[in-house]
Amino acid sequence: MVSLEKNDRVMLARQLPLKSVALILAGGRGTRLKDLTNKRAKPAVHFGGKFRIIDFALSNCLNSGIRRIGVITQYQSHTLVQHIQRGWSLFSEEMNEFVDLLPAQQRMKGENWYRGTADAVTQNLDIIRCYKAEYVVILAGDHIYKQDYSRMLIDHVEKGARCTVACMPVPIKEATAFGVMAVDENDKIIDFVEKPANPPAMPGDASKSLASMGIYVFDADYLYELLAADDKDDASSHDFGKDIIPKITREGMAYAHPFPLSCVQSDPQAEPYWRDVGTLEAYWKANLDLASVTPELDMYDQNWPIRTHMESLPPAKFVQDRSGSHGMTLNSLVSGGCIISGSVVVQSVLFPRVRINSFCNIDSAVLLPEVWVGRSCRLRRCVIDRACIIPEGMVIGENAEEDARRFYRSEEGIVLVTREMLRKLQVKQER
């Protein structure tokens, strides 16, 4: 382990990102989000009033100084590719800066899809080697967080690690969805289990487990050796969490990086913010949290902006309807191009070009772009997918049985409405 002085850290914070390439794994479907990902990959799902989920990983790279990025795509990639081409074409090729889109290469006979997260990188190794990076930062494209990857790179170098895994404590009941690790006093990973049925607790806190965040830093040459060996292993599932990280752990080459050391937040005393918005409830809750008085995630930090594709839209408008009712909103995010006419919107998130007609009550709802809500509707605890037309007088979120019959209703009572669901409902009503 190397002890670094403050000046050395400042210098490395500038140099290490320039020697690195980031690979964002963005091919996942996100089946737990149900119909919300039927026509788009999970990283392309809308979030926070104007963003896509992948914007967080991309913005973290940009703000950390990593300007060489590969985005590995697969499932329903058109929306994702279109978003990146329109919103992330800011890099300078002359300065060797880029965002490369890397689809499945289908280099294996009979294989059309990536066999696992490690195989997604393996299939693109010929391209990745051409980047001539010393370090490879591997990221999930479907998490909401702000992190300075340069700090993680410094930690990787300081510990003399060949592989570094970002980690944070999670409630033990949620740890079954993550890789869970045990570490020694120097943060060396001494045990790693992917998605255990009975997660081991952290020493000193029986209520939590130490979970992998799916964020890795590798020495590039070491990664290439690992992937070459894994590719030849017929018994492998070719996955970082299931195969690669456990193997490195057995070899004593993996170290943990506590997320609080590199988490970017305005309040240093606050809990580090990282969300896997993989379920409908988690997605709904994370969106609505941004509309609270003091959100856990600060989206107004000018020192660490989250970038996205910006459309040229007029400002949001709140108008009085012909009956004299005023358009009002409270504790909500309302994006450009929205019109609220004689209705009340409370604790909700409205994406661009949403139209709320008169006499509506919108409470704790997430309305994706171009949603049109007819007069006299009541929407509560729901997510309305893009371009849905909600008929006049429709009530959503008040009758559990009716919601479950017409739409998708989660166990927690969050209702998802899509255009296809509305179309089927209309067909039934016309019979």
Swiss-Prot record:
Activation and inhibition: Allosterically activated by fructose-1,6-bisphosphate (F16BP) and inhibited by AMP.
Q: Which reaction does it catalyse?
A: alpha-D-glucose 1-phosphate + ATP + H(+) = ADP-alpha-D-glucose + diphosphate
Supply the alphabetized keyword list: Allosteric enzyme, ATP-binding, Carbohydrate metabolism, Glycogen biosynthesis, Glycogen metabolism, Nucleotide-binding, Nucleotidyltransferase, Transferase
Q: What would be one Pfam family of this protein?
A: Hexapep_GlmU
| E.C. numbers | 2.7.7.27
Its annotated pathway reads: Glycan biosynthesis; glycogen biosynthesis
> Which GO biological-process labels does this protein carry?
glycogen biosynthetic process
Against InterPro entries, the record matches this protein to: ADP-Glc_PPase, ADP_Glu_pyroP_CS, GlgC_bac, GlmU/GlgC-like_hexapep, NTP_transferase_dom, Nucleotide-diphossugar_trans, Trimer_LpxA-like_sf
Q: What CDD domains does its record include?
A: ADP_Glucose_PP (cd02508), LbH_G1P_AT_C (cd04651)
Query: What is the stated purpose of this protein?
Result: Involved in the biosynthesis of ADP-glucose, a building block required for the elongation reactions to produce glycogen. Catalyzes the reaction between ATP and alpha-D-glucose 1-phosphate (G1P) to produce pyrophosphate and ADP-Glc.
Q: What family name appears in the similarity comment?
A: Belongs to the bacterial/plant glucose-1-phosphate adenylyltransferase family.
Q: Describe the protein's quaternary organization and the partners it interacts with.
A: Homotetramer.
Spell out the protein name for this chain. Glucose-1-phosphate adenylyltransferase
Q: Which organism is it from?
A: Salmonella typhi
